[in-house]
Amino acid sequence: MVWDWHLLALGVVTGILSGLLGIGGGVVMVPVLVGLGFSRHQSNAISLATILLVALAGLVGFAVSDAVDFPVGLVMGAGGVVGATVGAKWAYKLSGVALARVFGLLLLVVGIRMLWGGETTGSVSIDVPWSLLLAMGIGVGVGVLSGLTGVGGGVVMVPAMVFLLGMGQHLAEGTSLLAILFTAGAGTRVNLGNRLVQWQPVLLLALTGVVAAGIAALYAQQIPADTLARTFAVWLLLVAGRTLWKARPSEAKPSENR
């Protein structure tokens, strides 16, 4: 296909971002896939299926560096399964324009928060009952957004773990990748039932993405977290602006209703 090399290149970028920032990479994949001609629903489904493979590779790299909090990741991931299942079912019923607006608003909010930065609120023990509920609640909320927008949820989970659970940036990134496996897996299961997943682009994206994520994760802790986060925040804001501009009422097309 004419866009095979585009997908391989996109896989590299996605893998690098996943390994460095602890995100699934959907914020990159979805807008590019839409630009390559896939529908918004197809793009979301392809993105989530790819994230499942790429996040696993990144997780291995962080685990080798002992930068994964498994109890927190498992609790958050369990909540994410519930949320992602609900979100993916909602997404199937929404128009492409509505999904684009949700996606754009998500990027806008997260981009502003990452650019703003700030200090953590302090360490919170996951053994405390209310903090378990907090982690579970974060997982459910992130899961809904994941199912709706086709992102793994790392762009929300990492800031949430840093500012609400008091985690360090790199530990939050590694833990995020563990939770992402649950959200992406749950969303992909629903998308498979709706026959939205196209495996050829998924395999092309994963082919380079898995390798890039594994390598990037090994180098992630050598790069200042603030530099990475704020640079990425600027990119998020640019994509958010473009997405919301194209989804404004005057630009909406009848064909985008599905």
Regions found by a protein language model. Give the residues of each.
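Proline-centered helix-kink/hinge sites
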Residues: 30-31, 53, 158-159, 182, ...
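Transmembrane helix boundary and interhelical junction motifs in multipass membrane proteins
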Residues: 21-30, 148-160
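Juxtamembrane transmembrane-helix boundary motif
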Residues: 1-14, 34-36, 40-42, 60-148, ...
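Acidic (E/D-rich), amphipathic helical modules within compact regulatory domains
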Residues: 23, 30, 35, 40-42, ...
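Membrane-embedded alpha-helical segments of transport systems
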Residues: 49-57, 178-185, 211-212
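N-terminal signal-anchor/start-transfer transmembrane helix
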Residues: 8-19, 27-28, 186
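Short hydrophobic/aromatic, small-residue-rich stretches within specific transmembrane helices
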Residues: 47-51, 73, 77, 176-180, ...
